[in-house]
Every structure is written in structure tokens, then in C-alpha cells.
């Protein structure tokens, strides 16, 4: 059967489904919808003269056409999220962007917002970025943001255009945030001279940028960060060494799985499970050469702290502070989901292999030695987390210096009676208040560094206070819940929630004091 016959049959099929006669002008003359029986494509009683035809009956040809339709069962080979080819939707690419049609201006604005949202930054920064681009293009916009999507309405000269953009997943990329900041400075200076295609070429450069670090480098960064984290929690050399191995293996596996395009929770559970098992194997290995090494099992919690969602937790609080409730609640829900999944997997593995979150043994260090080591380990921890967020080395070092000051100050305030004995204090500052002060100091120092180094403020503040997130408290609360110890579970949970709540409050206060645009609602 040739192509012309197939097209004729397809047109006949479409004509059968025309319920109404388009040529009739009056409603009374329209045909009534036919019953479903009349649409039987397979004629069970063929006419007598059909038997004399040399061509196959029409019903057979219809069945042949329908059988050729592609059928999809099981796993699809392609991605389920459709990717936008921005160059194909541009109508006036060689025209200056300020004089382009509203649809082309909307594509520039929405692509800019998409790249910022995909970088993991908060709703206020995404909206601010889109507003600045729209201001250059002479467009008024209204944006409704969530964790993975936004709806943007563009208004210009009495015309209105609405566009929706969605992402397949979320993550953190501070280097891309920095690139977008440079892009904004460029267009705010020369943006009226660029064509639509030139805008999209600049945005394509940002979008196609590769991660700065390979999975093994991400694993090494997590190993250093979690090893330092264990010391700051009170662990010793054995716990630090085993956490180094566990976190390195776990985050390497997690980064490799994410690089393959698999789901975040699959990577999360695999990474946490491997981290706990690797910690135990490293502990067994040390037990062969160090007597009593098996008594240092409590450090396994530190091996899984690389999954703590510091960026979503902090940006959720900042979004809620700016009344971006939809984005803030979704980010908070996402962060809580990660914490719950990670702690459940950690508890399950710990129960299977016999690990328990006991208290760390005292190290017996002098106040001066402890303070100096806290400064060093805070720097190492923040530097490692910054690398995990894809910060360039210099940016990670700047965040590490800020974290070394603010986190050491926080820990010193909590342990004031022993760290500053000449003050004669009987008790230290509550951890919640100390977390607020630490976050406030991080925000103020980041404001100074932003002026000198041109790094985005959020790329410095969030990594510097991620190390203050009470991952140990969160895990212990879930552990005691799974063991039905309600009293301990509530105690650790309330402590963790209060500390997490005060961290974005401290950053928000610092931002309010130093950023006029943040202070005002419009």
C-alpha cells in the first residue's frame, strides 16, 4: 500500500470524528453526535463486492496502520523531562533585545531565572535577577517561584505574555551563581547593545559550563569536611580517620550516581549506606593495629554528614523571611525529606552492623590547643563543603576563612566556662543563641568579602554556616525514634529544630543591616 493510500485512509478516519458540520450556520441544523457503535473501525460484515477486489479490505488496512503506531512499555530510553531549545523559539534573533518582540524578551528573562533556580539559590535572588534583566529590556514582570519551577508574566505596552519554566531536579552550584552575577553586571552596563542571539549565547555559556570537580574530588572534599566535622563534635583521631574513609567512599558513590542522571534519593541512600559500612570496615582495619579501636564506633554519624542539606535548609528560612512561602515551604519539605531518608538508612545500617551513637570520649586538650584546632578544622570543614557546592578554590578558601572565625566563636561561646575561665562564668551560652551569633558574624563578614572579592554573598554565607547545622542532633532524634525512646527523641529533635531555625535568622539580620534592597519589600 503506497503513502497516498495511507494518507487517504487517515483523512477518512478523521472525517468520521467530525461531530458537527462546520458549514451549517444555525445550531438547529447541526447533526447530533453519532453513537460509539458507528465508529467501529473493523467491519465485521464486509460487503459482497469486497471479495472481488484485489486490494485488502479497508478494515485490514486500518488495522495495519494502527499496528504500526509506536508502543512504549517498560523503561523509556530517553529522559522524561523535555529540554527547551531556546534558539528555536526566538523569532527576531538578530534584532536588538530591547527592540525585540515580547516573546523573545520573555525567553531571555525566563532562561536567566531558570539558570539561577537550577543553581540552588533562594527565591528572592532568582526574582531579583529576573527583575534586573527585565529592567534592562524595558519589561515589567511578575514571578511566582517554587523549588523546581516558576511562572513569569511579562507586560509591555499593553501586551501580556505568560511563560512557565520547570526543572527536572535541583542541586547547588555556587560557581554558576558567580557566573550569573558576572552576567548581570555585564548586561546592566552594555545590555541595550546586545541582540537576542547574543543574550542567549552568553546564557548558553553559563548553562553548558561543566562541574569544576570530578566525583573523586567530590569524595575527597567530603572526606576532609566530615573528618573535620567529627573533631568539632568531639571526636578523636580514630573517629576522624574512619569518618574520612566513610564519607569519601559515600560521597564518591553519590556523586558518580548523580553524574549518571539517576534520582537523588537513589544516590542518597546508596551513599549513606556505603559511608556507614566503610566506616565500620575502616574501624575493623584499625582494630588490627590499634588496641581498643573498636570502642570508637560513635564516629560513624560523622561519616554520613555530607548529605546534610544545608543550602535548602538555609534558603528555605530566607525565603520564608521574605514571605516567599511557596518556595520556602517546598525547600523546607525537600530538606526534611533528605534528612529523614538519610537518617533512616543510617539507622537501618547501624542496627544491622551493631553501631550506636554514643557520646565521644573527652580529648583532654588545653583551651588554647582546642581553640587553635577548632579554627583549623572549621576552615577545613567549610572548605570541603564549599568544594561539594562546586565553589572555585579561591571562593572556597574565602568561605573557609569566614567559617573558621564564626564557627570557632560559636563553639567558644557554648563552652565559655572552660574556654574562657577568667570570666568566671558558671554556664555557657545556649547553643541556639550561639548559632544565631555565629550566623550573624558569617553574614557580616561575607558582606565585607563581597565588596572586596566580588563573590556572591550566598556562596560565602551558606557554606560557612552549613558546618553549624546540627546533623548529630538530627540523627540522634531519628535514632531514638526508631528505638521508641520518645523522651530522648523529643529532646534531641527540639534542640536541632531551634538551632536550624536560628541560623537563617542570623543571616537574615546580617542581610538586613548591610543590604538596602533586602531590607525593603519593593
What are these regions (language model features)?
Residues 228-233, 249-257, 273, 277-286, ...:
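Alpha-helical membrane-inserting segments
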Residues 197-210, 223-235, 254-262, 353-367, ...:
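Short juxtamembrane and helix-loop transition motifs at transmembrane-helix boundaries
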Residues 211-316, 386-389, 393:
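Core alpha-helical transmembrane segments of integral membrane proteins
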Residues 166-243:
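Hydrophobic alpha-helical hairpins/lids featuring a short glycine-rich hinge
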Residues 1-197:
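Soluble N-terminal domains of membrane-associated systems
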Residues 269, 297-303, 314, 327-383, ...:
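Core mid-bundle transmembrane helix pairs that form the ion/substrate translocation pathway
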Residues 10, 15-20, 29, 34-39, ...:
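C-terminal transmembrane helix-loop-helix hairpin of multi-pass membrane proteins
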Residues 220-224, 244-252, 272-273, 375-381, ...:
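Hydrophobic alpha-helical segments embedded in the membrane of multi-pass proteins
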